[in-house]
Amino acid sequence: MKTALFLVFALAFIAVEGKMSRACSKPGQTVLAPDGCNHCRCSEKGILMACTKMMCPPRTIEKSCKPGTTFKHKDGCNTCKCSDDGKNALCTSKLCL
């Protein structure tokens, strides 16, 4: 049981590390964060390390939506709310890992 639990945590860590490392092509580089607003620094191993945590402007969508409804952003982790006229939406700007 302990071995299985260890393997689950190890695979989860590898998956997250692999996803984050794709953003860095060289150590020490500064790249745009996954939220599209903040910036992150790449570690010596080339993985995303330290990111700014500025408040980002609201994200908008490019198609109409049903007024007042909420839905998941295309990134899969942020949530959006449709405006009263159905022409815009405001979305959260969480860092998605």
Swiss-Prot record:
User: GO: which molecular function terms?
Assistant: serine-type endopeptidase inhibitor activity
Q: Does the keyword DNA damage apply?
A: no
GO CC list: extracellular region
Pacifastin domain location, by residue? Answer: 22-59, 62-97
Q: What is the residue range of the signal peptide feature? A: 1-20
- Any idea where this protein resides? Secreted
Keyword tags: Disulfide bond, Protease inhibitor, Repeat, Secreted, Serine protease inhibitor, Signal
Lineage: superkingdom: Eukaryota
Q: Which SUPFAM superfamilies does the protein's record reference?
A: PMP inhibitors
**Tissue expression, per UniProt?**
Expressed by the venom gland.
Q: What is its main location?
A: secreted
Write down the position(s) of the site called Reactive bond.
93-94
Q: List the disulfide bonds.
A: 24-42, 37-56, 40-51, 65-82, 77-96, 80-91
InterPro entries assigned: Pacifastin_dom (IPR008037), Pacifastin_dom_sf (IPR036201)
Sequence segments annotated as region (Pro-Pro-Arg motif necessary for proteolytic processing)? 57-59
Q: Give the protein family.
A: Belongs to the protease inhibitor I19 family.
The function of this protein is:
Inhibits trypsin activity and prophenoloxidase (PPO) activation, an enzyme essential for both clotting and insect innate immune responses. It does not inhibit activity of chymotrypsin and protease K, and has no effect on phenoloxidase (PO) activity.
Which protein, by its recorded name, is this? Answer: U-reduvitoxin-Pr11a
